[in-house]
Amino acid sequence: EVTDAAAEAQAIANVLGGDASTYRELLSKESTTFVYVKRQADVDAAAEVKKLALDGVYFIADTRREYPCGQIGGQVIGYCNVDGEGITGLELQYNDILSGTPGTYTAERGEKGLPIPGGVKEETPAVDGQDIMISIDIELQEYLENRVAEAAEDMTAAGGSSVVMDAGTGEIYAIASLPYMDPSDMTSAKSSSDQVKPITQAFEPGSVFKTVSATTILEEGTMTPDDMLFCPAVIEADGYKVSDAHERSDQTFSFRQILDQSSNVGISLSVQKMTDGFTKLYEHIQKYNLCEKTGVDYPGEASGTLQPLENWATITGWNVSFGQGVAVTPLQLVRFYGALANDGVEVTPHFLVSKPQTGEVPTYDTE
């Protein structure tokens, strides 16, 4: 039915944008009676094309996912492809719930593709997908994204991440990592912007891991907060030296001061002071599930890494005590700190709160 593919292609390109030669190739196909020229076109632009009354060009009503909050929470939500299938984020995690079942229409057609009067036809109505309610607080999410971006700029950092989680329930109220992504405009998305890195990437935590060592020591009962320990300015093992981040002389610290001063030397010696100290630290890291996946309902969760105990030298134990030579995801660390705030009960971080249509409220494991 297309009478002048070149002219029609140029007319379409003038309205929809893109390369006229691409449209011309589509309009010139001889091996098919149907081809999409543009899917999910803007409604106003489609109306302009319709006014052109082009031969052989027809219009099909379609649906597409809209993201009214744009970038805010975009990484968490994820995005769909042109067929409405979840590709990343919660769109992928809960695709089977959200997508429903597409309808079908089958009919006998003649040589020119026209329906045969009285021919066999079958129609199956579409079934809508379900809604889900998630834990994200959109105002807190926006605030968090702004703060992470500002902090990264102030520190000239290559990236940044942050998590806000309810320690008692595991509901994630806000979570963000640079660079951000707007699911309504994936053409401008940067590499890895579709990943929520506090979930998908492990990192070497550094001094925030000292709380893990301190909790181990307190649970083993080898030191109290006010016990004193001599802490040289530098300690050495296996040909390596360990010192604090700030220069100081030899000093004696209470265990409380070791944490307050964030002393690498102090926490190293405190761990080593336990009977089989490095073994105890290793066992407690395992006990706290710090290198294990949290079970969060988000695709692509990473595990942490910890060398097998048989490979530990003295310097390994020291390094691990202050968060080097070990890797965890930010969410794994948040879960650990959450357990400290939750009387030792560890929860499962999650986004899904309920399924309104069915009234289902999921339950999550605690330990």
Where in the sequence are the language-model features?
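Conserved short loop/turn motifs at secondary-structure junctions
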Residues: 31-37, 162, 270-274
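Extracytoplasmic
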Residues: 7, 32, 54, 71-73, ...
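Short N-terminal helix-loop-first-beta-strand/juxtamembrane motif that initiates sensory/input modules
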Residues: 55-59, 153-167
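Small/polar-residue-rich segments within soluble enzyme cores
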Residues: 3, 7-16, 21-129, 319
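Conserved, well-ordered alpha-helix/loop/beta-strand core segments that scaffold catalytic motifs
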Residues: 34, 117-160
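Solvent-exposed, polar/charged alpha-helical surfaces in well-ordered, non-transmembrane soluble domains
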Residues: 6-14, 21, 47, 51, ...
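Beta-lactam-recognizing serine transpeptidase/beta-lactamase-like catalytic domain environment
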Residues: 110-120, 167-207, 212-367
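Short, glycine-anchored, charge-dense loop/turn motifs used at functional sites
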Residues: 1, 144, 165-173
